[in-house]
Amino acid sequence: MASASASKYNSHSLENESIKKVSQDGVSQDVSETVPRLPGELLITEKEVIYICPFNGPIKGRVYITNYRLYLRSLETDSALILDVPLGVISRIEKMGGATSRGENSYGLDITCKDLRNLRFALKQEGHSRRDMFEILVKHAFPLAHNLPLFAFVNEEKFNVDGWTVYNPVEEYRRQGLPNHHWRISFINKCYELCETYPALLVVPYRTSDDDLRRIATFRSRNRLPVLSWIHPENKMVIMRCSQPLVGMSGKRNKDDEKYLDVIRETNKQTSKLMIYDARPSVNAVANKATGGGYESDDAYQNSELSFLDIHNIHVMRESLKKVKDIVYPNIEESHWLSSLESTHWLEHIKLVLTGAIQVADQVSSGKSSVLVHCSDGWDRTAQLTSLAMLMLDSFYRTIEGFEILVQKEWISFGHKFASRIGHGDKNHADADRSPIFLQFIDCVWQMSKQFPTAFEFNEGFLITVLDHLYSCRFGTFLFNCDSARERQKLTERTVSLWSLINSNKDKFKNPFYTKEINRVLYPVASMRHLELWVNYYIRWNPRVKQQQPNPVEQRYMELLALRDDYIKRLEELQLANSAKLADAPASTSSSSQMVPHVQTHF
């Protein structure tokens, strides 16, 4: 599978050009070998190494290290292996063996990646070969520790569409029918003074003043007060999001917060209560009181109903993914596969997230009540639940553009801590803030797409591309923890958006079986019998596991679509040429030319 991923990150128009090399005097040179490169990508060094392939044994090759990637090409005639690894994917680099190591290929480097693979290279002991490669890799894989920019800030790629324009919050809320006589758009956070990790634009109840919002924010963790994410187009029930209330051990109350939740409930006269979904296990919510947090009590919030969804915290999810990696890479133990997969608890966590989102979606769709969703700080499990519920409820988010907007809105603008959870350019691989929360969300989306194969405009390749560039640092889309930090860094001016890449070649990411349905609500089956491990993502690096290929019907359908597009294009060219001939014909023939029928296509 290594070779299959060789050109994954290549800029299509440049993938056969030679890479630039920076010599010691700073002059760019050309390297004779053809290595894929991106505009702004420079070669730092190259070395002959032995790649210790976990599947095929030692392979002699040449490794090229640029300011964006590690690229290995086999030098052996019987092996066409190529490795193409963005440096942003690297989590840890360790030296293997010492000066006294005598075993074959026992001296070199071990590289741990964030995308569930490890790389091992053996090097010669003489000439500081390992030291040089180690220092260069550490410097460019973890640029933040060396006062270097992430590659996104030197990437000079150009696309024919600007992905930064995909999401406009005013336009998105207008699509939802907002503002209206119950809800208003507030710019109280335009300078990020109310809440540093919230977007500049917030939708809040019409009856609540900005002064009220300031008082309410003081009673919510990180000032992340309840704000609107989505409104049902017919019954007008809403999905709100926030962080936990600052109740503490003494059971503190805040009349402004209590009144605010009543105002939210009263925006819809069809219901007498507000449903609060706390994503945490109840024992965790109680424990958070010791650190000043907590949950909404029945006494304080009498017109609300509280339900705990039992989704575990970031540390549990991190350990679960580590266990997944242990069973899928490099070797898979067939005889104990099911018990090994069960021991990771990964699919159980996926089930709980999906189950929670289904409850949120059903509560709103059925018109039972509006809902308020929170966890502890409201930027991890909360984002999973609101975005998945919105995906189930609103078919627009199941289009390519709609999904991009959903990610920009519920994850990026509302402050999911991408920099902390992924560790972009950071060498601290053991950081307790690292966690695969966004990966879990994408996994849930994939599970839904398997159960509803015609409901999503995008295909599996789209989801994998999003995850690959979650780590790559090629684009600015997932950099930093919140919008305030992105604005300080002028991210939209200095980097390229991932959506530019995707939207400039949408056909590559389209699901051929997609059927547009405006008002269809999706309720996936969240049982262990219907959930499965995403083989094409988690086990894609193992060549011994056959990847799930598109079925022949899908392949033939794609071929027919391409054939149709080709015929339509040729027909349009013929019609254009015919129109030009008719325009140039003498006036005397104009009457007879009107007898020529206009050809139409029935594709």
Curated annotation (Swiss-Prot):
A 1,2-diacyl-sn-glycero-3-phospho-(1D-myo-inositol-3-phosphate) binds at residues 288, 313-314, 376-381, 421. Coiled coil: none annotated. The keyword Protein transport applies. It is a peripheral membrane protein. The keyword Disulfide bond does not apply. SMART domains: GRAM, PTPc_motif. It holds the Pfam family Myotub-related. The active site is at residue 375. Allosterically activated by phosphatidylinositol 5-phosphate (PI5P). This is Myotubularin. It comes from Mus musculus. The gene is Mtm1.
